[in-house]
Curated annotation (Swiss-Prot):
Principal cellular location given in the protein's record: host cell
Cellular component terms (Gene Ontology): host cell cytoplasm
Disulfide bonds: none
Protein name: Protein MC132
Claim: Glycoprotein is one of the keywords in the record: no
Subunit structure: Interacts with host RELA (via RHD domain), ELOB, ELOC and CUL5; these interactions induce the proteasomal degradation of host RELA.
Biological processes, Gene Ontology terms: symbiont-mediated suppression of host NF-kappaB cascade
Compartments, record wording: Host cytoplasm
Top-level taxonomic group: Viruses
Lyase found in the keyword field: no
Keyword set, alphabetical order: Host cytoplasm, Host-virus interaction, Inhibition of host NF-kappa-B by virus
Primary role: Inhibits host NF-kappa-B activation stimulated by IL-1 and multiple PRR viral detection pathways. Targets host NF-kappa-B component RELA/p65 for ubiquitin-dependent proteasomal degradation.
């Protein structure tokens, strides 16, 4: 099995033993809020991991470094999985950090936060018509690999800019964002503010293997569940 070549580096603050505990308290400050989040996640197909967490790098087999090159946050034209499926991916990330509690080992720590960040970035691009040209092959997909300074975390097209836009920009729909999406934005913002300055130069989508093991991704069912939450 090949290790992922470009893991995200959580900042040094994550070395504190109570990092995930404090993070959970900031996002879900009361037991009732945490219980509600757990119920919402379970309704959308998330289950607490038993033993090895399914979002840990060791759970994914890589035949070569660029195996999942085009399955990530900027898929090719006509291959976008749909916003409902992306929200499910984001909810899996929320469940991972709040309930699976990755063990803190080593310094610096390596965790694949690209899952959550890429999901937010994809949702942002998906709902903004002004970014439609970025989906075309030859633009963002190809240039991303040859212009890392522009498409890296701190570049003008990087995740930092997109995530900030998602957090501070106007919501384009008449109804407010779902509770789940607000939780995800909050936890991602907290990670940024608490030391994730080294986060993700690359945004390879590493949950492709995860989705192959969980094929139940009906857009209609997901939409119904999201409307009920």
């Amino acid at each position: 099995m090949m290790n992922f070549s470009d893991p995200c580096l959580l900042g040094p603050s994550a070395c504190n033993e109570d990092f995930f505990e404090e993070l959970a308290r900031e996002i879900l400050p009361t037991p009732e809020a945490k219980a509600l989040a757990a119920r919402l996640l379970r309704r959308l197909g998330w289950h607490p991991s038993e033993g090895q967490c399914s979002w840990c790098p060791e759970a994914y087999e890589y035949l070569y470094d660029l195996q999942f090159r085009y399955t990530g946050p900027v898929p090719l034209v006509r291959k976008h999985p749909g916003s409902a499926l992306i929200v499910r991916w984001m909810l899996d990330g929320l469940g991972h950090f709040l309930f699976c509690r990755p063990r803190v080992q080593g310094n610096p720590l390596t965790y694949h936060l690209s899952c959550m960040g890429s999901a937010i970035r994809t949702l942002e691009l998906f709902r903004e018509q002004a970014h439609s040209h970025l989906w075309e092959q030859g633009n963002l997909v190809d240039c991303y690999w040859s212009c890392s300074s522009d498409y890296g975390y701190e570049g003008k097209w990087g995740q930092q800019a997109v995530v900030r836009g998602a957090l501070s920009g106007p919501w384009p729909r008449p109804d407010p964002p779902s509770l789940q999406l607000q939780c995800l934005c909050a936890i991602w913002r907290t990670c940024l503010l608490r030391g994730q300055s080294q986060a993700q130069k690359y945004t390879n989508w590493i949950c492709a293997r995860h989705l192959q093991l969980r094929p139940d991704t009906s857009t209609r069912d997901s939409d119904l569940l999201l409307q009920r939450c």
